[in-house]
Amino acid sequence: MASDNSVKFDDEYDIVVVGYGYAGGIAAIEAHDLGAKVLLVDKMANPGGISVCSYGAMRSAHNADEAFKYLKTTNGDRTPDDVVRALAEGMSRIEPYMRKLAEVNGAVVSPREKVANYPFDGYDTFYQTLIEEVPNFDPAAY
């Protein structure tokens, strides 16, 4: 028998983002900034998603063409080129994007040289972008 303890939820949103890791957070910000009413949900009490496994680092690329070559090799032609190209181009723009986002709270964004895992063409274009510090942020409070 169905329970009568259901919660009434009648709010409406243009976009519902499921998962509050880097990708979900950025998707929610972009949708909001374009004028959408956004709901961001996550199954965990604290945000971060799988992003916490990367110690807060985002894989970045100095050169989108070199990143494309590397990523195409590593995926063994299982992913369409336009998807691989979009990923490579996004990786080449993530550091300036994060610097812009960090302006709101004075977060310190730092690049760290860290080549890709395998010595294929383009591996040396990769590095990491990290958020080193967020002034007056106490993670223990969350």
Feature-to-residue mapping (PLM):
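Conserved redox-cofactor binding core of oxidoreductases
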Residues: 89-142
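Glycine-rich active-site loop/strand segments that organize a redox cofactor
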Residues: 58-90
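Structural recognition of the beta-strand scaffold that forms the well-ordered cores
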Residues: 40-42, 52-53, 59, 95, ...
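Fold-independent oxyanion-binding glycine-rich loops
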Residues: 20, 42-44, 55, 62-63
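N-terminal Rossmann-like FAD-binding beta1-loop-alpha1 element of flavoenzymes
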Residues: 13-40
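Surface-exposed patches in mature extracellular/periplasmic domains of secreted proteins
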Residues: 43, 75-86, 103-114
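Glycine-rich FAD pyrophosphate-binding loop
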Residues: 32-54
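A short, basic/flexible loop-to-alpha-helix module at the beginning of a structural domain
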Residues: 1-12
